[in-house]
């Protein structure tokens, strides 16, 4: 549960890594609301360990993005929203090892998995434009666990692999009960934006989202906004010196959580729920 985690007040690259915060929050949560400017699915790949447990445990994610995506991400989102998914074995979602491998690689299977998760509303996207003519540039979010406990954050990091593993980024974290008022503010901000009830953002169809090859945006600016989705796990040009791994404490915690019983995806039968509750009480 989120209340059992001693989150730090802030996380900064090179010290307490933002990636460490996101991973630990994901494995303790059942819902993740993310208010963004720029989204890249490479952020999911960077957090593959956390996302695999989050999804396998029934987690649901809602994401508010601006009107620029990579070509591959836009296609994956459109395919999911239109239920255009072929040859994806949904049972992989309850196999944590296979799911982690799927989410960590930039390949066709990853994007099919992303599309499938979108098609069954496990990950939802809403695209927005600013009413002021600029770019949506919010960077905040709220995690919620199955008991309703919440943790919020705000900071400099876009949701991408570059931001989580290479850039210098800082985020501030708000936890219960000391920061309940601030958490409620961010939850309200997200919910209003999601319902299209805010004066500074307007919803647009994903079809209208621009891709990084759009000529209206300078190449240099786009490269700054959206990373090139380099697979840092397999690219030897990136030294481990620059990419700080997850702490051993968190890796040990992930390993323990992988052993917890969970319901086969996607249905949860009453007999399984009773067996699970009996196991927990022993």
Positions of the model-derived regions?
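Phosphate-binding P-loop
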Residues: 278-282
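PLD/PLD-like phosphodiesterase catalytic module centered on the HKD motif
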Residues: 1-277
